[in-house]
Structure formats: structure tokens, C-alpha cells
Amino acid sequence: MKTFALILADGQASRMGGEDKGLALLGGKALIDHVIDRVRPQVSHIAISTNRNLEEYARRSPHIFPDARQWQHFGPLSALCTAANDLQLATADWLLVVPCDMPYLPGDLVARFETVSKRTPLCNAYYVETPITMHYNIMYIRPQILQSAIPYLFSGMKTLRSWLQQQRARPVRFEFDGHFADLNTQIDLQEG
């Protein structure tokens, strides 16, 4: 099975004072580098969605793209709508979507999603559930469903949760919430 990753690094990072969150340092290393190190062994290709510092991100993956102009500033759905027209991503069997600010992702993330997807072959979308919360921004989806994000966004809807519900996505349970800690502020980075 061919699984690609899409790392979302296109947020406005308002809680970081506008600093590019993916390039913020944790232990002397950019957050996105931590994420890449966690997902690279699990996937065959990595794409990055970003709206700034494109050259810097291109050093990490040659497959980068900004949000299409008509979808900018709509959060993660902007990246999904833009990715819907990416021919290279369309060749994957599955797409792992993760944010750039979760440096502790588990090493068995794709394997766990794969196991559940084999038991429920008619389901096209999954997301992470922990004892504390649902992580809708960590998805394992069939690239073909990305097209449905476009009319969803044009209809005025903007949440990943509702879009995933529309796709009849299923949660995949992970017991350790610490793997999914998102570092949103400078204080988070200092404590990280």
C-alpha cells in the first residue's frame, strides 16, 4: 500500500505572535523537522502545505505548495482543497495528514491506521482519538475524498470535524495523549 504524508504548515500562528510555527525551534531543531523525522519512516513521500518561507520548506521536501488563492485563510481545509488538485498526491492509496506542530507523533501511526482500515475497507477516512480528546487534524484518508472538501468549503463550512463527519470518518484510538501534544505557543516550546 502506498501512503503519502501531507504536513500542514500553512497556519497563521497567531498564538506564536505570527512566527512561522513549522520553523520555530524545539531543542535547536525546527518543529517541522521533528514531524518529518517521525513520519518519514512510515510513508513513501512527504508533501508540505505552506503559505510562506517556501524556499526554506523546499529544503525539506521538493513537494511543497501554498494554498490556492481562493481558499487562503480557511485553516486546514484550505490545504485539503488545494491538495485535491495535486496529481502526485492523487496517486497514493492513503494520505496521512498531520500538522507541523506535533513533534511527538507515534512511530506506529500509519501502521495503526492501516490495521483499522483493513478491518473496515469501506471507510475512506480516519482520525485520532485519545482518552482526552479527538484530534481531527491528524487524518488517514483516501486522496479521492479531497475533492469533497471544495464544495464543503464553498458552502460556508469550515471545520475539519464536520467535514470528517460528512465523510463518515471513524476514530482510531491511541491511549497516550502525549504523542499528540501540539506546541502552539512560545511557552509550549520552552516546556516541550
Swiss-Prot record:
Mg(2+) binds at D101. The keyword Methyltransferase does not apply. Its cofactor is Mg(2+). Its EC number is 2.7.7.77. GTP binds at K21, D67, D101. Disulfide bonds: none annotated. It catalyses: Mo-molybdopterin + GTP + H(+) = Mo-molybdopterin guanine dinucleotide + diphosphate. One of its GO terms (biological process) is bis(molybdopterin guanine dinucleotide)molybdenum biosynthetic process. It is found in: Cytoplasm. GO terms for molecular function: GTP binding; metal ion binding; molybdenum cofactor guanylyltransferase activity. Its main location: cytoplasm. Keywords: Cytoplasm, GTP-binding, Magnesium, Metal-binding, Molybdenum cofactor biosynthesis, Nucleotide-binding, Transferase. One of its GO terms (cellular component) is cytoplasm. Monomer. Transfers a GMP moiety from GTP to Mo-molybdopterin (Mo-MPT) cofactor (Moco or molybdenum cofactor) to form Mo-molybdopterin guanine dinucleotide (Mo-MGD) cofactor. The N-terminal domain determines nucleotide recognition and specific binding, while the C-terminal domain determines the specific binding to the target protein. Belongs to the MobA family. This is Molybdenum cofactor guanylyltransferase. It comes from Neisseria meningitidis serogroup C / serotype 2a (strain ATCC 700532 / DSM 15464 / FAM18).
